[in-house]
Amino acid sequence: MTIEQVKDYLRVDGDDDDNIIRTMMEASKEYIVSAVGEYDETDKTANLLFCAIVQNMYDNRELMQSDIQQRKAIEYTFRSIILQLQMKKAIKGDT
């Protein structure tokens, strides 16, 4: 995904945060590769997870302990999508 696509997802205007968004994009890709084994940029589910991870990083640059419930919900969502991607990869490997 391009930085412009990610900024559209984040609803970010301007270029002030481009460097930090690029860093978050790299970290998001590494996160997905570590969890699934690959990041298929043609997979819409993978792209959704990619953007959701970047958004989580961007929105929570200063995580607070009082937001534990919200973080747990986000982590559950990520795990659910990661499991779906792992299953897709396993199915592709069997064909």
Residue ranges and their predicted role:
Residues 1-95:
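Divalent metal-cofactor coordination and adjacent catalytic microenvironments
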